[in-house]
Amino acid sequence: MKIKGIDVSEWQEGIHWKNAKKDGVQFGMLRAGYGSAILYPEQYDKTFEQNYKWAKEAGVNVGAYWYSYASTAEQAKTEAESFIKALKGKQFEYPVAMDVEETCITTEAVKAFCSELEGHGYYVMIYANLDYLNNRLDMSQLTQYDVWCADWSDSCGYSRAGIWQYTADGSVNGIKGRVDMNYSFLDYASVIKDAGLNGYKATSDDTVPCVEAKKILEKLAHAKQDIADIEAMVK
């Protein structure tokens, strides 16, 4: 399964989401802001509300992400509170992600950020490139969270990736200039809605709980990688 998507911020202002959908875009990861925006409101992304509204109207599934600068658990919690404020009252079919790019970010900060979001009923994901995932973060402490891997190559080099950002130089109808392109390997929309996360209500009383849903998705991710490895061997 490969579901085509994009991730956007105020750098791609004025997106025509209906045209993007016609061009095959099925989901969009929207930047909500960065840093401690609850203390510094100018750090909220000025296009987040507009992108959310227009993507929804176009029938494009949405997730969200927050660009982090947190080096401590305390800073991470403040950032998470800022993110939650932006997410409140909305529904997201795709995960909400911590964007880990700055060298100051620690594993402890990532744990604190993700735990805060998860405690508020969100399906949480970690965005990072291969170097961070393999060398900078202790991913053994973060196995309960899905991974959105930035790896600008012909195939995703991280076996646990639920979403793969495969280029920052994409082109999509409805967007001026270049845009980050992604593939989702999992049907997040179904799992999130069924589990009653990200602003949705559970579809039934016996819905798979959040933690169990994540375990299922992790197994699917491993199965996806196993299939890819087998296909590579027979080519």
Mark where each language-model region is:
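Substrate-binding cleft of extracellular glycoside hydrolase catalytic domains
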Residues: 1-114, 118-123
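Catalytic domains of cell-wall/extracellular-matrix polysaccharide-remodeling enzymes
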Residues: 92-162
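Short, low-complexity, charged amphipathic interaction modules
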Residues: 204-235
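Functionally critical loop-and-helix segments that line ligand-binding/catalytic clefts
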Residues: 1-12, 18-19, 140-211
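Flexible, glycine-rich phosphate/dinucleotide-binding loops
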Residues: 36-37, 71, 133, 156, ...
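Residues that form generic nucleotide/phosphate-binding pockets
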Residues: 86, 194, 233
